[in-house]
Every structure is written in structure tokens, then in C-alpha cells.
Amino acid sequence: LNDRWPNCINNLDTKESLSTQIAPCLTRETSPIWMDSSTSTECREIAEAVGGDSIVCSKSGSIAIERFTGPQIRRFYKTSPEAYSQTARIHLVSSFLCSVLCGVDAPIDTGDGAGMNLVNIHEWNWDADLLEATAPELIKRLPQIAKGCTTAGQISDYFVQKYGFASGTPITVFTGDNPSSLVGMGASKPGKLVISLGTSDTFFAAMPGVVADPQGCGHVFGNPAGGSMSLQCFVNGSLAREEVKDKFGYDWGQFTAALINTPAGNNGKIMVPFFRPEISPRVDLKAPILNGSDAFKSWQDADAAIRACVEGQFINMKLRTDWMQLEPEVIYLTGGASKNDAIAQVAADVFQAKVQRLAVSGSVALGASLRAASHSLGLDLDEMQGQFCKPEAGSTIEPKAPSDAYNSASKVFEGLLRKR
């Protein structure tokens, strides 16, 4: 955005569209999206400038990531130096929309802001070393960083006059989809984990303190409800489960029966269930690793292979998230596979915590609504989450396996990865 930006949003004309009025403020016609991965060179440059990936991770909560804002800004500066020089303000989508709604230049919150490789997670402010490594004079182009409980401003007259909003309505600073979802799922305090079982599996939770992943696979963000939160993605999610199911020509009913008919621990038969390169941990496998009987290793034991796949996924998930120092009281499962009680039972057994399915839909929007009601109206967030973020009735699954059931399997799993 150029230097016309502040005056533009403060003087929006209801007779004109937002796009017509804001377009002249843009210093680039297109913006990269979250799937862009063209900035590998810039990631290396940023890491080298500050002393390596581990330093970037310890400072920002993540290693330098291609789709994160910092590397994208560096590429913009390198490829379009003139446009960069004309840029007076750089916003995330969340803070940009918040600014438009308020009619003032809004801050970036610690939740969405931590996904930039620019924010120091120990101070929750811009990190001078990372800014310098990214682009010149970047600090003057960035808005302030603010916690999620910050009032960004009041509703702009544009929206009052054009759409009938109540004048003086306070606007709570916007955040990203994952931090907002954490609140909307009722998991904004430590002790509650959320595991989303989808094409990729995602694990996120409120953290009791601020600590970065020493392996550089996970991410740390600001928790909009206060403190910090973690997020970690696992590429080999539902697609891996489907690969094993299809390998034996099973349907989902037979898949479930296989889990029910095999014991926790799978009699020592273990699978590293990576059918494609994984990011947690970062390994370039194209096929699973199997350890056990000859029949099992040659894919002749269908039921054991199915249990090994699901157990391997949750064992890997627990191993990769131990750095978060969590003591889960409950795991909230969401996503398509969460409906499967047999899969949920494996999660309960591996993590030694009760599992519940969430009945929440639209958790991102719900989280935003709960935050606004808590911050602006003074309503108790815990009470509202208890009312609006209830688990499905009768969905609680308690662990059945003994607490040490997966100790040996976890060690073997790690050994298989080291030997690959």
C-alpha cells in the first residue's frame, strides 16, 4: 500500500465501491497466496543472515517458510525494488480488512503476525535482526504488533451509513484462521488439544509457555485469548489411511473392524506410514517402512497393516509434539476421520487422554465472535465456550491401553526413521 492508504480508508465515500477507492493505494497488482513456494532462495538468505534455521526458529517460532510473509516481502523487494520503494505499509489480509472496517491503520495481532518470520515470540514485537535480514527499512512499512485482546478502533462511518452498523461499535483486532479456530473450538487454554484429521492431519493447542520446536517442524503463534499456541501439520493424513485401505480392497467398515480386532501395540508390528515426503519430521520417503513379521513386512497381514498405519500416525504425532510440553486433559477431534470411533480410540490410547468429537461448525467465525463478545462486551470467554463449543453428546472415548503400551513402539519408530 502507498502513502495514500491512511487518508483513503479514513475518508471512504459511500457512493463508491471499496475496490474503486482502495485500488489506487496498491503498489502491486497481484499478491502471492498461501500455497506459493517460490521463495526458497529468500528463506536461505534470511536464515544465513541471522545465523541459521535454528536461530530463525528460536526467534520467530518457525524456521523460514516459503509461504510466510517475511520471505515473500524479501522476494518482492528483490524483484520489484521500485514498487517496494513506493510501499508505505504492508498488511496481512487480516489487518488489512480490520483497517478497512475501522477506517484507521490497524495493528497486526500476535496470532497471524507470528506466521511472518518477523515477530519475536519471546517479546511479541518485531525482531530487529529478522527485519534487517528481510528488506531495508522494513520497520517503517509495518504496523504495530498487538495482542488479540486489543481494540483496533470503531466501525467506520462508511459502514454505518451504507450498511446500517451501529455508530461507535468497537472492533477487536483481527487474527488468522487457525488462532481464531482455537478459540472457536473451546481450546484456548492449555490442557485441551485439537487434532484435525483431514487430507493432512493438523495438531494445535494452547501452550503453557513460549518454546520453539528444536526440530524446526512445528510453529508457534500468539494465542488470541492470551499467551501462545502451537500448530503442526502432518502431510500423510487421510490419504495415507486410504492408501492402506485400498491396498487390501477394504471399505471403511472393514477398515474399522481391522482396528477393533487387533490389540493396542499391534503385537510389535510397526509402520512408518509415509506414502509421500513428510514435513513432520522432514523426511523424503515415498513408501512406508514396515517392521515386524515377514508376512506383515510383505503386506500379507491386512488387519495388522491397518492398525500399524493408524498407530504409526499418532505415535509420530506425539513424538513430534512432545516439544510443546503439553499435558492434555482432553483431545478434541475434528475432520472427516474423527467420526470413526476406532481411530479415536487409538488417539486416546497413544496420548493417554480422553477424546471427544467437536460439534462445532464454522469454528473460525465462532472464535472471532467469541473474542469480540469477550473483549468488547466483557462476557466471560470460558462460559461462552462452555455454551457454544460443546462436544458431541456421547462422543467421549477414554484410553483403554496401559500408559506404557507404546513406549517400545515409539523407540522402534524413531529407530526406523534413523535407519531409512
Model segments located where?
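A generic structural signal for short
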Residues: 144, 332-333
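Glycine-rich phosphate-binding loop of ATP-grasp-fold ATP-dependent ligases
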Residues: 29, 112-118
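A conserved helix-loop-beta module that forms one wall/lid of the active-site cleft
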Residues: 135-147
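Active-site phosphate-binding/coordination module
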Residues: 1-66
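A short, surface-exposed helix-loop junction/capping segment
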Residues: 107-111
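Small/polar loops that bind or transfer phosphate-bearing groups
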Residues: 34-35, 147, 232, 335
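Gly/Ser/Thr-rich loops at beta-strand to alpha-helix junctions
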Residues: 1, 338-339
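Active-site core segments that coordinate phosphate-bearing ligands/cofactors
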Residues: 40, 44-63, 67-106, 117-137, ...
